[in-house]
Amino acid sequence: MVAENQPGHIDQIKQTNAGAVYRLIDQLGPVSRIDLSRLAQLAPASITKIVREMLEAHLVQELEIKEAGNRGRPAVGLVVETEAWHYLSLRISRGEIFLALRDLSSKLVVEESQELALKDDLPLLDRIISHIDQFFIRHQKKLERLTSIAITLPGIIDTENGIVHRMPFYEDVKEMPLGEALEQHTGVPVYIQHDISAWTMAEALFGASRGARDVIQVVIDHNVGAGVITDGHLLHAGSSSLVEIGHTQVDPYGKRCYCGNHGCLETIASVDSILELAQLRLNQSMSSMLHGQPLTVDSLCQAALRGDLLAKDIITGVGAHVGRILAIMVNLFNPQKILIGSPLSKAADILFPVISDSIRQQALPAYSQHISVESTQFSNQGTMAGAALVKDAMYNGSLLIRLLQG
């Protein structure tokens, strides 16, 4: 039995080691082979073999390092080679699809958005494939070697098998085999992740939580959810990685949620619910500066910052409810920081202190007293979240090995 399993075990070790070496070169380059051996804790012979394969595949290149005062032969460092390797990053949201070409450094080559009707005679899968085909036709002169496709979207998703069980907004989606269909259509690997979880990964790799080992990221938008980074890794990355705080009950007598329950956090804290509440309460607050203008998240935040009592009360109410749920999560995960991704962050001076106070009042002091509550660096727009999926696939070696094999 051991002999039968041995080749697979060896392949996994090779993938893990190659990914670790690539990550070090990407993050620290130019870096010498000697330093790679020390940092990766691999034998010099192993480093030599891995680097040789990457050089032959044009995934890394050598660079002379000139050291001040050194008259001898310049040291040779390694850096990643990214410009000739592209991937498609795609994001599906309510009524819109974003498509972008990026190189392996995550640098944007071209990006555009197209309307994606919520209802159509054609199934959503067919329309997605059509948008991808047309995008490649429009930008074929800019396209280098296509390595992969990264897709982020809301819904209930089996990320490991690439199946979208359900999606909000697109009612015709049921057990959509998105990953398999696109891989067969394009011939490249497809990586799929919930948009909130992918955004959490992007912040950890490139943004506000870079370098932190334990992070909770909460998104308050049309939907409410959270992603968790624990010990440097996305929680449940291979399955349903979204933490469904939006469907945690906060009011048993509250409004019915689309999940079937009553009084979920999402029915109180989502952007749509907040604006609905503000509109309702405007009739009882004739002095509010929200009168006489379109009621939007921006106008609500601006009014709150200017001291409008109604706007402040609504935003602080959201903060208290979110903080109460976060206090439970803090007790479970003991994070270093909490990130908030929301259009309500325009009123961060009001929202964030309420969230912080709620956490400190209701979570264990040892876990909560040093936590910082900060805004995300990126917004949940565009295709940056998809870049995190490809970067992660290079770092864990799964995509890297495929590129090395040609």
Swiss-Prot record:
The record's statement on gene disruption is: Disruption of the gene leads to a threefold increase in malT expression. Disruption also causes the constitutive expression of ptsG.
**Which ranges of the sequence are coiled-coil?**
none
Record localization: Cytoplasm
User: Where is it predominantly found?
Assistant: cytoplasm
> A Gene Ontology molecular-function term?
metal ion binding
- Phenotype when changing residue 257 to A: Strongly reduced activity
Which residues are noted in the entry as Zn(2+)-binding?
Answer: 247, 257, 259, 264
Spell out the activity regulation.
Answer: Activity is modulated by glucose. In the presence of glucose, is inhibited by interaction with the dephosphorylated form of PtsG, which sequesters Mlc in the inner membrane and prevents Mlc binding to its target promoters. The restriction of conformational freedom resulting from the anchoring of four ends of Mlc to the membrane could be the primary cause of its loss of DNA-binding activity in vivo. Activity is also inhibited by interaction with the Mlc titration factor A (mtfA). The inactivation mechanisms of Mlc by dephosphorylated PtsG and MtfA differ significantly.
Tell me which Pfam families the record gives.
ROK
Instruction: Keywords in alphabetical order, please.
Output: Carbohydrate metabolism, Cytoplasm, DNA-binding, Metal-binding, Transcription, Transcription regulation, Zinc
Q: What induces it?
A: Expression is modulated by the cAMP-CRP complex. Negatively autoregulated. cAMP-CRP and Mlc work together to maintain the level of Mlc optimum in response to availability of glucose. Weakly repressed by NagC. Transcription is induced by heat shock via the sigma-32 factor (rpoH).
Name the CDD domains for this protein: ASKHA_ATPase_ROK_Mlc
Q: How does it assemble?
A: Homodimer. Homotetramer. There is probably an equilibrium between the dimeric and the tetrameric form. Interacts with dephosphorylated PtsG. Mlc and PtsG EIIB domain form a complex with the 1:1 stoichiometry. Interacts with MtfA.
Q: What is this protein called?
A: DNA-binding transcriptional repressor Mlc
Protein source organism = Escherichia coli (strain K12)
